[in-house]
């Protein structure tokens, strides 16, 4: 997904179709919830016959339209985190599989959410509605202040100058992928992943073969088995071709 242009490279579509024809299961692992996937991603999944979505950083996995593995946060840790963010006057959000609920709007929230074109709902989720991840909106200079009050059961992962994910300490895309593969009778050693951001770190450490984009985060590139061009230069297609997974 080329975020700045909000489009999918034609070569990526062709690569995924080639994998499908070989009987290889393809999936998207994303920090987004299913409800805020860009339309071009939904269309890509439909066009290429992609049946698995590892969403919300691995906390909600759907296969063939049905939940395959889910890891909701505890209601008390959600409530406590909300109380702490309110005390610090920091806007926060609760992510369900269908909506993103925000406590209130701030310039920081608008900057982070607007950058990705993510829709949200003002207000908090109804009692009993599962929350899979939380978000908070503050600059890096407040990191230490927030981390001192964040429940130990959660970990912060920054994805924007003003946006941070609060994820279960043991949660990651890797956990979601592992749970999905277990259900399908496959192992992590049989999996290959492409990534570029810090929320891909555990995934890259866990899969059998890790491919990182050339423009990816330096910490992630250090974990790569192979580095391919960025998506703007047909990176996924070129990487699969170079590795001999698909033919030219």
Regions found by a protein language model. Give the residues of each.
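Asp-based, Mg2+/Mn2+-dependent phosphohydrolase catalytic module
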Residues: 125-126, 206, 210-248
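Residue-level signal for inorganic ion chemistry
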Residues: 19, 30, 134, 177, ...
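Short active-site oxyanion
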Residues: 23-27, 50, 132-134, 189-191, ...
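Active-site phosphate-binding/coordination module
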Residues: 10-108
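Short, structured coil segments at secondary-structure junctions
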Residues: 44, 48-49, 57, 149-153, ...
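Conserved acidic, metal-coordinating active-site core of Asp-based
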Residues: 78, 84, 88-194, 198-203, ...
């Amino acid at each position: 997904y080329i975020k700045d242009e909000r489009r999918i490279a034609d070569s990526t579509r062709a690569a995924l179709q080639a994998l499908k024809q070989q009987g290889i299961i393809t999936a998207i692992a994303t920090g987004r919830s299913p409800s805020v996937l860009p339309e071009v991603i939904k269309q890509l999944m439909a066009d290429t016959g992609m049946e698995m979505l590892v969403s919300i950083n691995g906390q909600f996995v759907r296969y063939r339209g049905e939940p395959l593995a889910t890891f909701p946060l505890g209601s008390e840790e959600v409530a406590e985190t909300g109380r702490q963010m309110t005390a610090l006057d920091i806007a926060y959000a609760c992510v369900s599989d269908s909506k993103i609920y925000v406590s209130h709007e701030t310039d920081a929230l608008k900057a982070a959410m607007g950058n990705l074109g993510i829709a949200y709902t003002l207000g908090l989720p109804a009692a009993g509605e599962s929350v899979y991840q939380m978000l908070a909106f503050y600059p890096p200079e407040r990191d230490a202040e927030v981390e001192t009050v964040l429940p130990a059961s959660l970990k912060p992962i920054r994805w924007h100058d003003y946006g941070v994910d609060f994820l279960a300490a043991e949660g990651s895309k890797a956990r979601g992928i592992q749970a999905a593969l277990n259900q399908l009778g496959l192992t992590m050693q049989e999996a290959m992943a492409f990534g570029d951001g810090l929320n891909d770190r555990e995934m890259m450490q866990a899969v059998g073969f890790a491919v990182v984009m050339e423009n990816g985060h330096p910490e992630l590139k250090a974990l790569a088995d192979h580095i391919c061009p960025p998506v703007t230069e047909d990176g996924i297609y070129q990487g699969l071709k170079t590795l001999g997974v698909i033919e030219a």
